[in-house]
């Protein structure tokens, strides 16, 4: 009996050791309830609705699809991937360099505030509730402003979370946050917003698979109208959002 019990315990221990890395932290971090203040930002959608660029479900899907594939979605994912790799091996110099680049790439004051406020809030919340060996040391390398994608990549890398699902979760959360903003701006309803998320999900998957092959030299954006919209939003007469 003792032998059988011992064998069972050994088998149980082996099963736990062989289990895949839990992705539960991603499910917790990249949800609307995580305290980063994402609800306060629309990433130029508020201006796009005012200007008539976003009028309905179809135009919203097109606008967000462009932001994802040609704009900040792609660039942020590249930055998150490089922060993930640097954090995973404890390369503080590389982390600081990626973060400085990410902050500098923000095309306007409002979008810089958006990424830096969320980045610092995200990092503070993870450190407070999800400690891990090396997390505080990695965070200490980022003095002052912290870009949101860098904060996400850092936390996931330190926690040993795989890069591909981290990128998928990060990009999908980005889409969901922007769709939520669009619903509050009222050009679409909740059901239409859900369809937009489903429409963009394959693009999220494809981009998450592509990003690990890209370098910092591949950073770039072709969403000029959205970038200009972030400037115009600063003086927009009626505003619900900070960007």
Curated annotation (Swiss-Prot):
User: GO CC terms for this protein?
Assistant: cytoplasm
Could you tell me which InterPro entries the record lists for this protein? UreF, UreF_sf
Q: Which GO terms describe its molecular function?
A: nickel cation binding
Q: Which domain of life is it from?
A: Bacteria
Q: Which Pfam families match?
A: UreF
Q: Which family does it belong to?
A: Belongs to the UreF family.
What protein name applies here? Urease accessory protein UreF
Q: Which organism is it from?
A: Xanthobacter autotrophicus (strain ATCC BAA-1158 / Py2)
């Amino acid at each position: 009996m003792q032998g059988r019990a011992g064998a069972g315990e050994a088998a149980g221990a082996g099963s736990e050791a062989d289990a895949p890395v839990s992705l539960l932290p991603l499910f917790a971090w990249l949800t609307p309830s995580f305290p980063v203040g994402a609800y306060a930002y629309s990433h130029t959608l508020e201006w796009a609705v005012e200007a008539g660029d976003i009028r309905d479900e179809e135009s919203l899907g097109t606008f967000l699809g462009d932001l994802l594939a040609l704009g900040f979605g792609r660039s942020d994912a590249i930055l998150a991937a490089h922060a993930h790799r640097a954090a995973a091996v404890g390369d503080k110099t590389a982390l600081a360099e990626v973060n400085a680049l990410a902050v500098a790439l923000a095309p306007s004051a409002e979008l810089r505030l958006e990424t830096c406020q969320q980045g610092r809030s995200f990092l503070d919340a993870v450190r407070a509730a999800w400690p891990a060996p090396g997390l505080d040391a990695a965070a200490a390398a980022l003095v002052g402003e912290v870009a949101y994608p860098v904060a996400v990549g850092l936390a996931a890398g330190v926690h040993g979370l795989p890069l591909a699902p981290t990128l998928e979760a990060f990009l999908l959360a980005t889409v969901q946050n922007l769709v939520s903003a669009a619903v509050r701006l009222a050009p679409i309803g909740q059901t239409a917003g859900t369809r937009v998320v489903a429409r963009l999900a394959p693009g999220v998957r494809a981009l998450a698979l592509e990003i690990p092959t890209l370098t910092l030299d591949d950073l770039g954006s072709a969403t000029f109208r959205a970038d200009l919209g972030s400037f115009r939003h600063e003086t927009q007469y009626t505003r619900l959002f900070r960007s």
